[in-house]
Structures are given as structure tokens and as C-alpha cells.
Amino acid sequence: MQPSGHRLRDIEHHPLLTDNDNYDSASSSSSEADMADRVWFIRDGCGMVCAVMTWLLVVYADFVVTFVMLLPSKDFWYSVVNGVLFNCLAVLALSSHLRTMLTDPGAVPKGNATKEYMESLQLKPGEVIYKCPKCCCIKPERAHHCSICKRCIRKMDHHCPWVNNCVGEKNQRFFVLFTMYIALSSIHALILCGLQFISCVRGQWTECSDFSPPITVILLVFLCLEGLLFFTFTAVMFGTQIHSICNDETEIERLKSEKPTWERRLRWEGMKSVFGGPPSLLWMNPFVGFRFRRLQMRTRKGGPEFSV
């Protein structure tokens, strides 16, 4: 096993901050308890566009399923069952998306690399700690700096523009649920599209929809393409995330081939750590732990961050 001083290649050694350093630590370093009461949001142009596109595509799919395929159907129970199922999956997917986007992924407080903070740690002789030169914080083990969030994130897996946030220690659960529910709703939409095409061909496109045949074909084709793309992407991401959790290894650690200096959790221990508690239906609930939080603009030097 390598010594702790060489275990992370992305860490640079810098002296700790002094009282004369040109860094506004008073305004940028807030307590973790205070940050827990605020909503987290990253003001990144690309991320916000991707997040809005995600919502629009889900709303489009819901429109086609509801108004093009189900409401015109003569089978009442077919429409009710599939309508309730698809809309539930859509709500769960969008809720998981919101929780992923608005949850602090595990950001390390900025500017805490001060002598006063160091003295409060009561370090053992010879113990090595690291300072991130970009956000001036004491960098915990397995934390990595995100250039978009402009923060060090604990157990950072990757930054996903589609949720406009990093996937890290505190929001990985919601990201996994988001990919799962999008994949399930995509499969459901593709099955409904197939049944709708069969129904329209048998009825010669006259009674299968309230829209004209050309419009119906265009809407269904676009939904099929969307469903295929969404299912492929989210199914792969879901499998990758589950594999990472079971192996207790983030995507960054895997890509950088970092040798583990921590004691890896067993497969079920990793799942329990991410989803909380023993296996239950609560694992699939994106509303667990939800509470309304206050929104507050915060000015950050040199960063597009607007965190809550």
C-alpha cells in the first residue's frame, strides 16, 4: 500500500492560509449545518439548458402518451392503467431529477484551510493532510475538485450536465433513481408506441388518434427515437452506478486507476450506505428526507455558483 502522501494525484501541496492571505474566508466558508438548510443550485449555462431539455422531453413524452395514445383509446381500463403507470413513473423521474440537482452532493466548505482550523483538528504527529489550491479547503480522502461547481466534492463520481450538478456522496441515490425511472418510463413508452402503431395500421389510421395521420406518425416516431435514446443512456448509467456502488469505487477513481487506501465496503454494505438502511421500498422513494429549504443568493468570487 502506498503512503498517504502519494495516494491522490490531483492534489497539490500548498501552504495553509495565513491571516494575510488574499482570500475572503469569512464570506465563503460557512458551517455545514448552515449549508444543510439551503438548497444547492449551480448556475452553469450548459447545465441549466440540459436540465430544462430533460424536463421538456419528459413532458413531451407524457403529452404523446396521454393525448395521442391513451385518451382516444376505446378501452377504458387500458387507458386508465397505462395512464396512471406512465404518469407515476414520470413524476418519480422528475422528482429524482430535482433532488439530484438541488441536493448538495457533498461539497467541502471553502476556505477552511486556516491555521485556526488546523489547530482545532488535533492532528497526530506525522499525519498528512491536503489543501486544494483551487477552493482553499482541507481536502478529505476520496474528494475531488469539480471545475464547474468550483468545489471539492466528497466521493465525487462525475459531473452530469443533465442534472446540472455533480454526483457525489449525498445525492448519488437520487441520481440512481433518476436513471432507473427514466429507463422504465422509456420502456413503457416504447411498448405503448408499438401497440399504437399496430392499432393504427389495423384501423387504417382513421380512429386511432384525434390527430391527423401525418401528425400522429411524426409524434410517434419522435417519441420512439426519444425512448430509444433515453433508455440506452439511462440503462447504461444505471448499470454503471450500481457497479460503482457495489465495488465502492467512483467513476473518477476507476478512470484514474487510483489504488484504494480505504477499506472497501461489501456489496450490500455499499448499497445500504448509499440508499440508507436495509433493503426496502423506501430505497425507491425520491421523497425520503425531503423538506422545504430557504433559497438565498450567494456571491462567490470567480465562480458561477448560486447555492442555496
UniProtKB/Swiss-Prot annotation:
Domain DHHC positions: 130-180
Post-translational modification note: Autopalmitoylated.
Location (main, coarse): Golgi
Reactions catalysed, as given in the entry: L-cysteinyl-[protein] + hexadecanoyl-CoA = S-hexadecanoyl-L-cysteinyl-[protein] + CoA; L-cysteinyl-[protein] + tetradecanoyl-CoA = S-tetradecanoyl-L-cysteinyl-[protein] + CoA; L-cysteinyl-[protein] + octadecanoyl-CoA = S-octadecanoyl-L-cysteinyl-[protein] + CoA
EC category: transferase
GO cellular component, one term: Golgi apparatus
EC number(s) from the headed UniProt entry: 2.3.1.225, 2.3.1.-
Keywords for this protein: Acyltransferase, Golgi apparatus, Lipoprotein, Membrane, Palmitate, Transferase, Transmembrane, Transmembrane helix
Pfam families documented for this protein: DHHC
Coiled coil, from the record: none
Keyword Acyltransferase: yes
Transmembrane segments: 51-71, 76-96, 174-194, 218-238
PROSITE patterns associated with the record: DHHC
Subunit field text: Homooligomers. Heterooligomers with ZDHHC3.
Domain remarks in the Swiss-Prot or TrEMBL record: The DHHC domain is required for palmitoyltransferase activity.
Name of the protein: Palmitoyltransferase ZDHHC7
Species of the source: Rattus norvegicus
